Amino acid sequence: MPPFRRQVDDERHVPDIPEIRSDFAFHMEGSQDIDAWVGMFLDDLRRQRLDENTIVFFFSDHGGCLPRGKGFVYETGTHVPFIVYLPPKWRHLANGQSGRTDRLIGFPDLAPTVLSLAGIEPPAYMQGKAFLGEYEAAPKRYEFAVKANQASHYCPERAVTDGRYKYIVRYIPYKHDALMNAYQWGMPGNICWDETYLGGRCRSAVCPMTFERHCAELFFDLAEDPYEIDNRMDDPACAEEIRRLRSEMSRFLRDTGDLGFFLKAQRLTPTPLCEILRDEGYDYERLYRLAELSSKVTPESLPYLTECLASPRKEIRYWAVVNINQLAATGQIAKVPEAFAGLLGTDDPEIAAEAAYAMCLTGRSEEAMAYLTAAGPNGRLDSHKLTMLELLTLAPDAGSYFTGDVRRTVRAVVAADPRQTA
């Protein structure tokens, strides 16, 4: 069997359709090209007699557009190839490490490691830890992964692993992996996965997974399930490991001052946002608690969430809306607070569009869809409205929202500017 075909056969986390096979084969061919390209540089080092004085790092970034690859916190999106070669005269800097290792490292560790190899102590403010050299740190127990903006869709996720077990938390659980962005959906595999599912031609258990509403939390045993398909969150045998990794994730947010829960527009400031917040003495704890609440929110939290809707802080209002949306998406409430209707008339398009989602789910779709389909003075729909309309197309009762008038309005806007389909 040809090597590419054999490797594609092993991709159990994606449906077996020709376009996905083609995308994977194309990626593997590119990997072979890179291998030859790296060989040219190594040969050049030898020709210049620099090879015995050069420490070589070889690694990739997080990939291109393969389905469930870059942009997702599954291992297929975060686990990259990484090789370090130390010539014999510098091998003592490996401190006895050789061959393959299961040691956990991440890209923040690269700069401290290079400093350590040069005999320079990494400064304490660096988040990463050196894994080679004079100032090598003790191996880490945990490695973390972050999903921030996914093109036009804001859907933050975080993950933590100890190498064996993996915990993922999705802070906006009602959003789907199948929400498109122009970068990844430029590949045939993603497009045809959509067409296969929406056309009712699914033949694979993994085919519907990206179209289902997210579980708020996921837990995987990577030794038994390296493709992260079997979510073990409800397995009593995993309860202690889940508690441990959930606690580590909560600690990570606070230790790093994670800014990913501020909206994109808030982070586009001339002065770095972290400096602004530091000078204000910002209360991160309230924000993190609100974001973490979304995975376990119940109607008992509604009075507090309604209070948060009146906060002067945009990010607090936004995360209050997210929690109320989650209550609506999981059928825990039949109506939203009356303050939601007022959000549609505010100058906060991110919050207004998000609020329209829960209004659709709780019997107020007419006014919500009127807002979402109202074009601006330039005749275009803003990106926040478009992303929420896309999310609503995946709702179980989407047909009741996209009536004839709504469809005609959306088609007219898109026809006037086809770029808005992304």
Labelled PLM ranges:
Residues M28, D35, G39-L42, R46, ...:
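Non-transmembrane alpha-helical segments in soluble domains
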Residues E75, A151-D234, E241, P272:
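C-terminal, low-complexity/hydrophilic appendages and adjacent surface loops
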Residues M1-I105, S116-A124, G186-G189, D194, ...:
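Active-site-proximal cap/lid insertion segments
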Residues C202, C207-A216, E224, R232-A422:
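Long, internal low-complexity/basic segments
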Residues E52-T54, S98-D162, E240-R243, S247:
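Polar, surface-exposed loop/tail segments
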Residues L42-L45, R49, P87, L117-P122, ...:
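A generic secondary-structure signal for well-formed alpha-helical elements
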Residues F82, A130, E143, N231-R232, ...:
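Conserved beta-strand positions that form and line the central face of beta-propeller blades
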